[in-house]
């Protein structure tokens, strides 16, 4: 596609999100097929899906990274991001939602809302992303569209409303009644679902469809009370309401996040996908509808507002980094204002560093097309950025706006890693550096005492796949240790320290003197280091060295060497020596001072707590709950339907290694579980003592 101008109102930036195995990638594949982007349908279970382009994805049949692509439908340009449904890859969902204007949530018609669907929905709530829903797999045994709609209301608190009525069910599912147009749509199998026939509503469904349509109209009237004419028509003459009127009210309700219309179909059997494409265009917002962009000025911390205009100042967000063996480092960006041209010099305002764009690329999974410019509303990729990482703002050199960052969760699991041979040491370091740039939830640290390299991530599958990538993409063979819990340390009261670092050994000595005050920061806020030095007691040029020393000191705690979190440090006083003071001396002194202060501030160890959902046959419920209690679990609640029970609990990660295997033997292989990091909590005293002893 050439760089043709696209009216902003005709762009849709959408994500496809769901629980693992609800059929997200298959739905995206069908969208690409019907919109003419691919000529052959790729199947996930055959390992041929276009959007699952990494080898690991094709082998495992799951989506790991958010693949991006662009399609055209009904005169609109739709940028689609297909996100992973596995909890270990939550950051991919989080960073996609941050840059999207709307989303399609895909649900399994048999299971309805599953635990990971709740996580993704919560993330979308956080960023206020308007959503429509697609109940997929209507051809499966036990499929129930209306039960899925109800489960969205109950479990997600969504204002879910049916806009379809299925015709037939399970293997007899042949189409649906569109409650807005009041037409029955029958799909023709011989055209792979590309064509369908519109017929009258079947006699046996007429009464039900009339009730459903009235319920839909009533709901629309309720969410837009300012539209009195529409409300009057609903009450007095609902049959006189036109399709256009319904679409207008629905669009407004979706954009304002007041309603979540629910469609049905089966992507695998090619039914209902074009209807989904139609409403993506009709109901989901364009960048124009999302309105003003807010950010903070670097100069004075005041709030800045920008309108989404092509001729406005540039404001873009880097939301993903990818390393390509041929092109190098690729940065995915979303442009909120202005235009970005190939070859232009820009500012990374988050880091206050200048960057230059060498190439602009439009992406289709892992294929790419060169572009001369991207403009407001575009999602694309650029080559040449050296400093930018996930969550950084890119802007004009004179603009200096910083947009809201992407929230990055703390890793919960650690593994030691070492190269198989000495020759691989440098390659391993490069691979780890590239992978941690791509994925902010993957951290690489060194254990000072043992000299081991430790990798940390969101779960065993996460680290497993990254290890796979090291072997395949970076050709590095590495040995890894057993997974360990990623504990953290923090403080529980205020503390202070006065530290002098003095060395005299002939010639020039070393001198630094630093006074610190520390206090607990609010949970989840991270560490903050602030200089309150006045009157030049520590010269200005040494302050960054003190801050760096403090930050390095916080990397390993005082109880068991785990990183300190949620600590606020104020550098309040100190002194220096005209000759003997140096940056190195102040850095060492800063590190010693913060450690000393932490020892006086009642330090504790924190452990990751996981939120777990177990779905089990009711006759095994007692065993499952008993087992979770033995693992220091806290049962949050349970619910039952159709002979199956779901137990929700919070359990320390340290108790959950090998849980899948023991759950299998406990329930004869009939139960399933999903787990995700919830928060960090204080370790019981007895366990803390054991950890410190180790």
From Swiss-Prot:
Domain tr-type G: start-end pairs: 9-288
Keywords tagged on the record: Cytoplasm, Elongation factor, GTP-binding, Nucleotide-binding, Protein biosynthesis
Subcellular location: Cytoplasm
InterPro entries, sorted: EFG_II, EFG_III, EFG_III/V, EFG_IV, EFG_V, EFG_V-like, EFTu-like_2, G_TR_CS
GO terms assigned for molecular function: GTP binding; GTPase activity; translation elongation factor activity
BP terms from Gene Ontology: ribosome disassembly
Principal location class: cytoplasm
Superkingdom, natural source: Bacteria
Gene Ontology annotations for the cellular component aspect, listed alphabetically: cytoplasm
Binding annotation for GTP: 18-25, 82-86, 136-139
Family: Belongs to the TRAFAC class translation factor GTPase superfamily. Classic translation factor GTPase family. EF-G/EF-2 subfamily.
Function field: Catalyzes the GTP-dependent ribosomal translocation step during translation elongation. During this step, the ribosome changes from the pre-translocational (PRE) to the post-translocational (POST) state as the newly formed A-site-bound peptidyl-tRNA and P-site-bound deacylated tRNA move to the P and E sites, respectively. Catalyzes the coordinated movement of the two tRNA molecules, the mRNA and conformational changes in the ribosome.
UniProt name for this protein: Elongation factor G
Source species: Chlamydia felis (strain Fe/C-56)
Source taxonomy: Bacteria, Pseudomonadati, Chlamydiota, Chlamydiia, Chlamydiales
């Amino acid at each position: 596609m050439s760089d043709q101008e696209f009216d902003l109102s005709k762009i849709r930036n959408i994500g496809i999100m769901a629980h693992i195995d609800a059929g997200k990638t298959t739905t995206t594949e069908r969208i690409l097929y019907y919109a003419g982007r691919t000529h052959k349908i790729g199947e996930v279970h055959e390992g041929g899906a276009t959007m699952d382009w990494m080898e690991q994805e094709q082998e495992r049949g799951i989506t790991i990274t958010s693949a991006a692509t662009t399609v055209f439908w009904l005169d609109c340009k739709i940028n689609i991001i297909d996100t992973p449904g596995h909890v270990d890859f939550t950051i991919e969902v989080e960073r996609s939602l941050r840059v999207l204007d709307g989303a399609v949530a895909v649900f399994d018609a048999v299971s309805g809302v599953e635990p990971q669907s709740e996580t993704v929905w919560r993330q979308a709530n956080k960023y206020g992303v308007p959503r429509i829903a697609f109940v997929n797999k209507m051809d499966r045994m036990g499929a129930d569209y209306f039960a899925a709609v109800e489960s969205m209301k109950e479990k997600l608190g969504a204002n879910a409303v049916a806009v379809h009525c299925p015709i037939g069910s399970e293997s007899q599912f042949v189409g649906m009644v569109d409650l807005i147009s009041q037409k029955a749509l029958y799909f023709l199998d011989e055209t792979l679902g590309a064509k369908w026939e519109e017929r009258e509503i079947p006699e046996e469904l007429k009464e039900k469809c009339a009730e459903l349509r009235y319920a839909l109209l009533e709901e629309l009237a309720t969410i837009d009370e300012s539209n009195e004419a529409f409300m009057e028509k609903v009450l007095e003459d609902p049959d006189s309401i036109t399709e256009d009127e319904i679409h207008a009210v629905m669009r407004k309700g979706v954009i304002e996040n007041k309603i979540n219309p629910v469609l049905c179909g089966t992507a695998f059997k090619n039914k209902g996908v074009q209807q989904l494409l139609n409403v993506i265009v009709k109901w989901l917002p364009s960048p124009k509808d999302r309105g003003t962009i807010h950010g903070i000025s670097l100069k004075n911390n005041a709030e800045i507002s920008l309108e989404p205009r092509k001729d406005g100042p540039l404001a873009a967000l880097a939301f993903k980094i990818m390393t390509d063996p041929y092109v190098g480092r690729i940065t995915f960006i979303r442009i909120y204002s202005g235009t970005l041209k190939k070859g232009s010099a820009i500012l990374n305002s988050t880091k206050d560093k200048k960057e230059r764009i060498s190439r602009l690329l439009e992406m289709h999974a892992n294929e790419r097309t060169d572009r001369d410019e991207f403009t407001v509303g575009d999602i694309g990729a650029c080559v040449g950025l050296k400093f930018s990482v996930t969550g950084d703002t890119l802007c004009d050199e004179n603009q200096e706006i910083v947009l809201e960052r992407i929230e990055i969760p703390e890793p919960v699991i650690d593994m030691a890693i070492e190269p198989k041979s000495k020759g691989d040491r440098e390659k391993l370091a490069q691979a780890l550096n590239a992978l941690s740039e791509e994925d902010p939830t993957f951290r690489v640290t060194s254990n000072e005492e043992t000299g081991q390299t430790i990798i940390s991530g969101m779960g065993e599958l996460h680290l497993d796949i990254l290890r796979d990538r090291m072997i395949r993409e970076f050709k590095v063979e590495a040995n890894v240790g057993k997974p360990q819990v990623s504990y953290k340390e923090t403080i529980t009261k205020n503390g202070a320290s006065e530290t002098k670092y003095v060395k005299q050994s002939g010639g020039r000595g070393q001198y630094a003197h630093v006074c610190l005050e520390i206090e607990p920061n609010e949970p989840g806020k991270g560490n903050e280091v602030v200089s309150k030095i006045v009157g030049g007691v520590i010269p200005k040029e040494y302050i960054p060295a003190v801050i760096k020393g403090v930050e390095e000191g916080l990397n390993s705690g005082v109880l068991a060497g785990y990183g300190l979190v949620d600590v606020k440090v104020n550098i309040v006083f100190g002194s220096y020596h005209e000759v003997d003071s140096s940056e190195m001396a102040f850095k060492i002194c800063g590190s010693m001072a913060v450690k000393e202060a932490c020892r006086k501030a009642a330090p504790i160890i924190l452990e990751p707590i996981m939120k777990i959902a177990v779905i089990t046959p009711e006759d095994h419920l007692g065993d499952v709950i008993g087992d979770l209690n033995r693992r220091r679990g806290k049962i949050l609640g349970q619910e039952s339907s159709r002979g199956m029970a779901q137990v929700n609990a919070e359990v320390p990660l340290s108790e959950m290694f090998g849980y899948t295997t023991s759950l299998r033997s406990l329930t004869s292989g009939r139960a399933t579980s999903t787990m995700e990091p919830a928060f960090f909590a204080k370790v019981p005293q007895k366990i803390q003592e054991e950890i410190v002893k180790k």
